[in-house]
């Protein structure tokens, strides 16, 4: 009898783990209409000027099925609130200096690169047979440098989920974004806590946790410096199916930071379009976009190292 109970419990736990892998679905007009209804009616701050935002959605590595849904979310937020105008592109030459000047901010949408090199720009340039190997490497470095300089000089940058992998082995890119992708345990239900419940950037959550199914991203490189203002965190002791021990109980999954004269917003949620079916995440995205555009003012001073892991 006891053995049967153990087997039954094991089966239930296994079923729960499998169910955490949400079903993918194609972007449809019906889904977009649902998002339009859930999205904020107006922006938190009325923009003082017209903003144009580049949404870059090219990937060469892992194909996140949520890419078109994330594009749609940014379009809905822009059109419904009038907070900014969006232009979509998968052309790396948008990172030429003359082109970046046309935008007030850039949104990087799940731009996963091919491992282990992890250089999306070089992935694309490798296909250009008119260039030598040296020319490809030089151009890739130039385009990356252009984006970094753009933010340093005052441009905004919003980095969504897997986009942190775009130039994952570049320390310069890591320092701009606030970290690099390390790995993630399997998809599972994650409870995201608010680092500062009264911070303007987490107003969307109304002081409550945000529970959803996602990949629990963990980070390295510049992340260890904690040179950012954390917004959301997860308790790693509650994660399941960890392939190795995690060094800190608290890991941040979203933050803001100054970078030169510019502003950066990293948001790990979400791998799944279902997460956007909660209006709170839509407002969080909108507020983050308004932050990088300079409209939503808030404390973005870096956390103190001695505060790491304390809430």
Residue ranges and their predicted role:
Residues 50-61:
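Short beta-strand segments enriched in small/hydrophobic residues
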Residues 60-72:
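Glycine- and acidic-residue-enriched helix-capping/strand-helix junction motifs
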Residues 1-22:
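Bacterial Sec-dependent N-terminal signal peptides
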Residues 59-62, 92-94, 111-115, 157, ...:
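Solvent-exposed loop/turn segments at secondary-structure junctions
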Residues 53-54, 100-167, 261:
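Short alpha-beta junction capping motif
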Residues 82-96:
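A short, well-structured beta->alpha microelement
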